[in-house]
Amino acid sequence: QSRTGWQRPDGWERVLKSAEQYNLASEMVVHVTDGDGTLTSLLDDSAAMNRLVQAIGEEAQQYSGVNLDFEGLGFQDSGENLRQVQLKFTNFVDLLNQELKTNRSGLTLALHAPNSAYPGYDYQALGQIADRIIIMAYDYGSKPEPVNQVEQAVQMACSSVPAHKLLLGISAPSETAESIATKVGIAKRYNLGGVALWRLGVINEGMWQTLRANLIAER
């Protein structure tokens, strides 16, 4: 039972089977927020981390890999406290990656942008572990998302992680068919590995037309 509101949908097995038939990669999303201190408590408990890593590894065998979306780390932290938050999360990611690689499963991280209010993510260290990183360059406050801040986030990420490992996260509810083309243009300008869209079900036909005209789907 999900505590964050995102449930595994009915018929998910059929979706996975169809993805396999079309030679499409699939990822299991593991999503937790730290609003109530859940993540902080987890990262302070080595036994709990090991149990979670093992559970994720077992479940992930049905997928091509895992998309780890641990949100909210580092808010109001600074100095040594912030550094400890970053180290603990990096340690967890390293443990998870080791477990996943025993079954040749991939690891994607969905991270708050480097210029967000949540600095608890060491992009350089995480970029050396994960296969891909999604820069969640949204929730800056205004809509469409401000181009200057999105581009700044990409520049900051590229200074620490090879561009081909980075995907620009785009929140469809924050964009229009016109503005989403601008965001895709930023990803292209910096030679990123691609874009990641949040989420299916809220991307309108105008956006799809823009995406089809500007992107090549990779399986």
What role is predicted for each listed range?
Residues 1-219:
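Secreted glycan hydrolases and related glycan-binding modules that recognize and/or cleave
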